[in-house]
């Protein structure tokens, strides 16, 4: 079971890292919670997109035209918003 979870996690990371920037960039990736989403009594909106940190992006891990919007930075990824 642990091997299956590791395999699925690795597949998600590879899918996020290979996301093509020019093909509907806002719909790729995993939704994440931005600071501006805030706590709400009926649940939070996930308006950010989780981006993998790669060499082609800025120091914050977000693509051009996007900004970091999360509460804390991840080791492999950041929550970014357009």
Curated annotation (Swiss-Prot):
Question: Span of the secretion signal?
Answer: 1-19
- The answer to whether UniProt assigns keyword Secreted to this entry is yes
What InterPro entries does the annotation carry? Myo_ane_neurotoxin_sf
Q: Which cysteines are joined by disulfide bonds?
A: 32-79, 34-69, 62-80
Task: Answer whether the UniProt record assigns the keyword Secreted to this protein.
Answer: yes
| Protein family membership | Belongs to the sea anemone sodium channel inhibitory toxin family. Type I subfamily.
**Name the UniProt record assigns to this protein:** Delta-actitoxin-Aeq2b 1
Source species of the chain: Actinia equina (Beadlet anemone)
């Amino acid at each position: 079971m642990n091997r299956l979870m590791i395999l699925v996690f690795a597949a998600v990371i590879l899918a996020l890292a290979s996301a093509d920037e020019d093909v509907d960039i806002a719909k790729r990736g995993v939704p994440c919670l931005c600071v501006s989403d805030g706590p709400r009594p009926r649940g939070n909106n996930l308006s950010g997109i989780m981006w993998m940190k790669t060499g082609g992006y800025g120091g914050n891990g977000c693509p051009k035209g996007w900004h970091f919007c999360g509460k804390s930075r991840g080791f492999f990824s950041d929550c970014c918003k357009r």
